[in-house]
Regions:
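Surface-exposed extracellular loop regions of Gram-negative outer-membrane beta-barrel proteins
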Residues: 1-10, 37-43, 55, 78-85, ...
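Outer-membrane beta-barrel signature, preferentially recognizing the C-terminal barrel domain
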Residues: 2-6, 166-170, 234-314, 333-345, ...
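Short loop/turn motifs that connect adjacent beta-strands in outer-membrane beta-barrel proteins
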Residues: 14-25, 116-125, 185-192, 220-226, ...
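Transmembrane beta-strands of outer-membrane beta-barrel pores
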Residues: 15, 29-35, 132-138, 173-175, ...
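Surface-exposed loop/turn segments flanking beta-strands in extracellular/periplasmic regions
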Residues: 45-89, 139-163, 248-275, 324-356, ...
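Gram-negative outer-membrane beta-barrel transporters
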Residues: 187-189, 312, 329-473
C-alpha cells in the first residue's frame, strides 16, 4: 500500500535589468506512506537467537534467569534494561513474517539566477544557482515478531538481525551550489560554442566535492563540419543505506541441551551476543569521469554524427567485507554438570569445556567498485532519395567495458566442527578477477513511400555483430596476506608456507577450476528484421 501527498511550486521573476534577466525558483514536498508485508517458511532454521541489542550480553532462554558455573561464577550477563529478554534455539522449521512501515519525507528547493549579455562578438549566458534536498523516513521500518525472526543470512556464521526503525536514521541534507557559463563566439562564418560549469555538493555529516564540466563545439567547415568535445566529473552521494547501515549482530550458542534427554524444565540455552558497527567512516562520494569527442557532418540532406567516449570510475559504491570487518572473538563452550538436580524445575550448573578464538565477519559500505567503459556511437542519416521515394538511416554503437574491484578477496575453507582447528582468513589480491564485456550492434532503417495508395513501408534490420563477456584472473590461488583467527590482525603471507598445516585452509589451488581460463567462442551475428506497413 502506498499513499502519497505531493506539493510542487515554481515560478519566474522577470527583471531584465542589464545582464540580469530573471530569477527562477522551484520547491516541492513529497510525503509517501508505505506498507509492505512478507511471509515465508524458514527451514533448517535451528539456530540460536537472542533478543539482546547489547554487545557482550549473555542471556538464557528464560528471561532474568541466571546460569552459573560449578564454582558459583555467573555465566549470564544481562544488561540493564534487558531483564525481560531471552535467548533460545529456534525450531528447525517455522513460519515467519514481517511488515515494513515507511513514512518517506522528501523536500527540495532550487533557486536559479540567469544572466545574459554580449561583449564584442561574444554572446554570454551565465547561470548561478543553488539547490537543497532533505530526505528521510519517519516510519517504524522492518517490524517482526522476535519470537519468529526472519530467516538469517547463511553466508555469515552466527549472523542475526534485530528490528530497526527508519525514524532512528538521521535525515540526509544535501546542498548544491553551481555556476555555468555559455559562450557563443561568431568568428566570421565560424561559430564556437563553449559551455563550462562547476558544481559544489555538500552532504551534511558526510563530505563535499567539486564537479567541473566543459562542452565545446567549433565549426571546422561552416554549416558542414563541426567538431565536438566534452569532459566532466560527476559526484554521486551515497544513499542512507550506505551512510547509516544496520549494525552487525551475531548470536553465539555457548550451551544447548535441547536435543538431550533432559526434562523439559531442565532444557536451556546460553547465547552470547556480539554487536559491531558496520558504518564506514572513510566512505566518500563516488566520482565518475567522462570525456567525449565527436564529429558532425552535414551535406545537402545527409547528416552524419559520430561520437567516441570514455567513462571511468575508481571508487563506486558497493557493500562487501573489508580488512576491518573481521573480528576475532572468544567463543566459549560449556557442558552441564551431572547428575542434574533432582528438582526438575532447577537447571544444572555448567563447566567450561573449550574457549577458542573465532573469526566473525560482516559487510560494510565501501568505495571499491571500479569500471572503465569505452565506445563509439554513430547515426548516419542519408536523407531521402526522391527518385525512389526512399529514406535510409543507419545507426549503431560499439561498447567495451572492464570492471572489477579495488577490494581484496577473502576466502577460507572450513572442514569439520572442531573450532580449535578453524582456519585463518586468506586475503587475495584485488586483481584476482576482472570482468570484460564487448558489444557491437547496428540498426538499418529504410522508409519507402507509395503516395498513389497512401502507404508507408518501413523495413528495420538490426544486427548484433558481437556480444560477448569474459573474465581474466590474477593471483586467485595463493593469498598475499591473511587475517589471523587468533587475534584478528592482518599479516603478510609467505608463499613458501602454503603447504604447511596451519595454512591449508586458505590454499585455493585445488579449488579453482582451470577451465576458467578458457574463453567462450564468439557467437555468430544475430539478424532481426521487422517490416511495417502503414
Amino acid at each position: 500500500r502506498d499513499l502519497g501527498l505531493v506539493f510542487n511550486t515554481n515560478g519566474t521573476l522577470d527583471i531584465n535589468a542589464g545582464w540580469l534577466k530573471n530569477i527562477r525558483y522551484a520547491a516541492s514536498v513529497n510525503y509517501t506512506n508505505r506498507h509492505s508485508y512478507f511471509q515465508d517458511e524458514a527451514t533448517n532454521a535451528d539456530w540460536g537467537y537472542s533478543q539482546s541489542m547489547t554487545d557482550g550480553a549473555v542471556l538464557s532462554n528464560v528471561p532474568g534467569r541466571p546460569v552459573y558455573l560449578e564454582d558459583g561464577t555467573e555465566v549470564t550477563r544481562v544488561p540493564v534494561g534487558e531483564e525481560s529478554l531471552k535467548a533460545w534455539m529456534l525450531p528447525g522449521s517455522y513460519i515467519y513474517m514481517y511488515d515494513v512501515y515507511g513514512k518517506e519525507l522528501n523536500t527540495f528547493a532550487k533557486l536559479t539566477t540567469n544572466f545574459a549579455g554580449k561583449t564584442g562578438p561574444i554572446h554570454h549566458r551565465l547561470i548561478l544557482g543553488a539547490d537543497f534536498r532533505n530526505s528521510g523516513n519517519l516510519g517504524k521500518g522492518k517490524v517482526f515478531d522476535p519470537e519468529n525472526p526472519p530467516y538469517r543470512n547463511l553466508s555469515y556464521d552466527f549472523a542475526s538481525q534485530r528490528n530497526r526503525a527508519f525514524k532512528d536514521i538521521p535525515f540526509m541534507n544535501h546542498l548544491g551550489v553551481y555556476a555555468e557559463e555559455n559562450i557563443q563566439w561568431l568568428m566570421g562564418k565560424h561559430e564556437l560554442n563553449i559551455s563550462a560549469g562547476i558544481r559544489w555538493d555538500k552532504v551534511c555529516g558526510f563530505g563535499d566535492g567539486f564537479s567541473p564540466r566543459i562542452n565545446a563545439s567549433v565549426d571546422i567547415i561552416p554549416r558542414h563540419l563541426t567538431l565536438r568535445g566534452a569532459y566532466g566529473i560527476t559526484l554521486k552521494a551515497p544513499t542512507l543505506l550506505y551512510m547509516y547501515p544496520d549494525k552487525a549482530y551475531f548470536d553465539l550458542v555457548n550451551f544447548n541441551n535441547a536435543s538431550t534427554s533432559a526434562p523439559d524444565g531442565q532444557k536451556f540455552q546460553v547465547i552470547t551476543t556480539r554487536v559491531f558497527d558496520a558504518e564506514n567512516k572513510n566512505l566518500e562520494m563516488a566520482k565518475n569521469k567522462k570525456c567525449e569527442l565527436g564529429l558532425d557532418l552535414k551535406f545537402n540532406k545527409m547528416r552524419f554524427f559520430i561520437t567516441a567516449y570514455q567513462e571511468k570510475c575508481d571508487n563506486g559504491y558497493t557493500i562487501a567485507k573489508s580488512l576491518n570487518t573481521f573480528k576475532s572473538v572468544p567463543f566459549v563452550q560449556y557442558s552441564e554438570i551431572t547428575p542434574r538436580p533432582s528438582d526438575e524445575s532447577q537447571i544444572a550448573n555448567l563447566k567450561e569445556i573449550a574457549t577458542n578464538p573465532y573469526l566473525l565477519s560482516y559487510t560494510t559500505p565501501m568505495n571499491a567498485l571500479k569500471y572503465l567503459v569505452r565506445g563509439i556511437d554513430f547515426d548516419f542519416d542519408f536523407g531521402r532519395v526522391d527518385a525512389i521515394r526512399t529514406a535510409f538511416n543507419l545507426n549503431g554503437s560499439y561498447m567495451w567495458r572492464k570492471s572489477g574491484s579495488n577490494n581484496y578477496m577473502f576466502w577460507n575453507k572450513i572442514t569439520g566442527t572442531d573450532y580449535s582447528k578453524y582456519p585463518h582468513m586468506g586475503v587475495f589480491s584485488p586483481d584476482y578477477e576482472t570482468d570484460y564485456s564487448e558489444r557491437l550492434a547496428t540498426n538499418l532503417r529504410v522508409i519507402h513511400n507509395i503516395p498513389q495508395i497512401g502507404l508507408v513501408v518501413t523495413l528495420t534490420a538490426n544486427v548484433i555483430w558481437k556480444d560477448r563477456s569474459w573474465k581474466s584472473y590474477g593471483n586467485d590461488s595463493i593469498p598475499i596476506k591473511y587475517i589471523s583467527r587468533l587475534d584478528g590482525k592482518l599479516y603478510d603471507f609467505n608463499p613458501d608456507d602454503i603447504d604447511s598445516e596451519e595454512f591449508i585452509g586458505i590454499d585455493r589451488r585445488s579449488t579453482v577450476n582451470p577451465t576458467r581460463l578458457i574463453r567462450e567462442g564468439v557467437m555468430p551475428p544475430l539478424l532481426t528484421m521487422n517490416l511495417n506497413i502503414t
